[in-house]
């Protein structure tokens, strides 16, 4: 596994544990269709939440939040529409969150959960 892939998997694991700890139910993880992949789909109370996970080991490429704008957000919305088409009984209250996982070379891992990010 490439280092980038391993870092991404690590971040998704941390994000999934964080979401479960705050009471969200993981419905899907790494859901794929021909247009791309959704990192996490969770039920948070009455809301169906599509979560994009961004993991960084440093600030060399900017913050993880900067990576989920414009076309990336639009693509996630399209993927969410595809997921909903395959799951017609899912909640109609939809939210898009971003989880930023920071894994510095020293110190603790940090998770920032941005609800309703876009």
Curated annotation (Swiss-Prot):
It comes from the Bacteria. SUPFAM superfamilies: Restriction endonuclease-like. InterPro entries: Restrct_endonuc-II-like (IPR011335), tRNA_endonuc-like_dom_sf (IPR011856), UPF0102_YraN-like (IPR003509). One of its GO terms (molecular function) is nucleic acid binding. CDD domains: PoNe_Nuclease (cd20736). It holds the Pfam family UPF0102. Belongs to the UPF0102 family. This is UPF0102 protein Francci3_3586. It comes from Frankia casuarinae (strain DSM 45818 / CECT 9043 / HFP020203 / CcI3). The lineage of its organism: Bacteria, Bacillati, Actinomycetota, Actinomycetes, Frankiales.
């Amino acid at each position: 596994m490439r280092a980038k892939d391993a870092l991404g998997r690590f971040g998704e694991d941390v994000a999934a544990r964080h979401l479960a700890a705050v009471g969200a139910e993981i419905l899907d993880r790494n859901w794929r269709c021909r247009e791309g992949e959704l990192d996490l789909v969770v039920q948070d109370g009455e809301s169906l939440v599509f979560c994009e996970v961004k993991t960084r080991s440093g600030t060399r490429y900017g913050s993880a939040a900067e990576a989920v704008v414009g076309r990336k957000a639009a693509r996630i919305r399209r993927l969410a529409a595809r997921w909903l088409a395959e799951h017609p009984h899912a909640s109609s209250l939809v939210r898009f969150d971003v989880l930023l996982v920071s894994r510095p070379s020293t110190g603790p891992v940090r998770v920032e959960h941005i609800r309703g990010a876009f």
